[in-house]
Amino acid sequence: MKIIHKGLVEYLPTFEAMKTFNANRTASTEDELWVVEHPPVFTQGLAGKPEHLLIRDDIPIVQIDRGGQITYHGPGQLVVYTMIDFKRRKTSVRNIVSALENSIIATLAEYGIEAAADPKRPGVYVGERKIASLGLRIKGGSVYHGLALNVNMDLSPFTHINPCGYAGMEMTQIADFVQPCPTPDEVAAKLTAHLETQFTPKADNNE
């Protein structure tokens, strides 16, 4: 699995690059993780409803092809795009989602933050507050899009929407629990290590 750090990049060209990567991949294309941050942007998934945008401001909205509703990306949020051929790995999308959730939970545990997944709602939560979002697109036996983990960002734009379609959803971030707060790059080093562990094929034996 190749890990590519792209830094702070605009959302739309990154979205187009994901689609191109997935369309052009072959049976031998190596899976990739793209580690990025984005300037402020709302992204509206395939199930998105206009009423979940509560306040219209100057933050752009991009209609995209992942599952789910509307969410927000901005500087200080760690985004990891997961370009994974799950068919080749002989796994399921549900297992991919669990691997993403478990990697986030393990990363947060390294900072003393107790987080959990919720079987009724996508994402990772600290108590009732959401700290990470997940959204995937399944196409041709592969997935793309991925996860967004709030590290140290301006959370106020989340109040302009119903995050992921949930009215009143309260958001949180690593900076609410850890000071001095690690940088997104520092968190990325831990998170990608956990992702690599989750996606390393396990030996098939009876030992």
Swiss-Prot record:
EC top class, as a word: transferase
Pfam annotation, one family: LplA-B_cat
UniProt miscellaneous comment: In the reaction, the free carboxyl group of octanoic acid is attached via an amide linkage to the epsilon-amino group of a specific lysine residue of lipoyl domains of lipoate-dependent enzymes.
KW Zinc-finger (keyword) present: no
Marked site: Lowers pKa of active site Cys: 130
Active site positions, chain numbering: 164 (acyl-thioester intermediate)
Gene3D superfamilies the UniProt entry points to: Bira Bifunctional Protein, Domain 2 (3.30.930.10)
Claim: Electron transport is one of the keywords in the record: no
Native source species: Neisseria meningitidis serogroup C / serotype 2a (strain ATCC 700532 / DSM 15464 / FAM18)
Protein name: Octanoyltransferase
Subcellular location: Cytoplasm
Binding-site positions, substrate: 66-73, 133-135, 146-148
GO cellular component: cytoplasm
